[in-house]
Curated annotation (Swiss-Prot):
Glycosylation sites: N58
Membrane topology per record: Lipid-anchor; GPI-anchor
Record-given protein name: Ponticulin-like protein H
Keyword Membrane applies: yes
Function noted in UniProt: Binds F-actin and nucleates actin assembly.
The record's account of how the chain is modified after translation: The GPI-like-anchor contains a phosphoceramide group, rather than a phosphatidyl group.
Secretion signal span: 1-20
Length: 203
């Protein structure tokens, strides 16, 4: 632990200058000064104003770009913060023109004239731009497909109707006849009664 604290203290002392300020490490130029803003007034751009006579475009290091109808590429040099500007005959930047390659160092926000090419460069940071002379392809914006929300169908609960139970109609039971004897017996008895009555009247 003591050794670690000593190393931290030693590093802090080494980073302090005589005036008491912290010395910042020099940024890596390949990551800080990696973009360049170019402009041209050598007639490569449309002088009638259809396009701006100054084509401002960010160009990444080692990327072939067409700026004002000229193919250019800025390459990283051999020493720190050194770059090379070169024009090419082809759009893949493999055939250099007869123009001499220009070597320059990059200082942030300092504009540099690049020889007879009348290109200028401002070292800056940002995103690689598209070619200013090319018409960007118009990609139609895709209409998002709206998926309708599927509301679940609620099946209604059917309550069965309670039909009252109808009691079956029971026909009244006919009580058995209490008359005894057959029909002939009744007739005979009636005849006997009539005979007795007639006999009584005859007396």
């Amino acid at each position: 632990m003591k050794l670690l604290n000593s190393l931290v203290l030693l590093a802090a002392l080494c980073a302090i200058t005589a005036n008491g300020k912290i010395v910042e490490d020099t940024p890596d130029p390949s990551t800080v000064y990696n973009l360049f803003q170019l402009s041209s007034s050598d007639g490569g751009c449309d002088p009638a104003g259809t396009h701006s006579p100054d084509a401002n475009v960010n160009v990444s290091v080692d990327k072939c770009r067409n700026v004002c109808n000229k193919n250019i590429k800025i390459s990283k040099g051999t020493s720190t913060n050194q770059f090379t500007f070169q024009t090419y005959n082809d759009n893949s930047c493999s055939q250099a023109t007869s123009d001499q390659a220009l070597s320059f160092t990059c200082s942030d926000n300092v504009k540099k004239q690049l020889g007879t090419s009348i290109y200028s460069v401002i070292c800056s940071t940002g995103s690689d731009s598209t070619n200013p002379t090319s018409t960007p392809s118009t990609t139609p914006s895709a209409t998002p497909t709206v998926t309708p929300s599927t509301t679940p169908t609620v099946t209604p609960t059917v309550t069965p109707s309670t039909t009252p139970t109808v009691a079956p109609t029971v026909p009244p039971t006919t009580p058995p006849s209490t008359t005894t004897g057959s029909g002939s017996t009744v007739v005979a008895s009636f005849g006997l009664i009539v005979s007795i009555l007639l006999a009584s009247l005859a007396l």
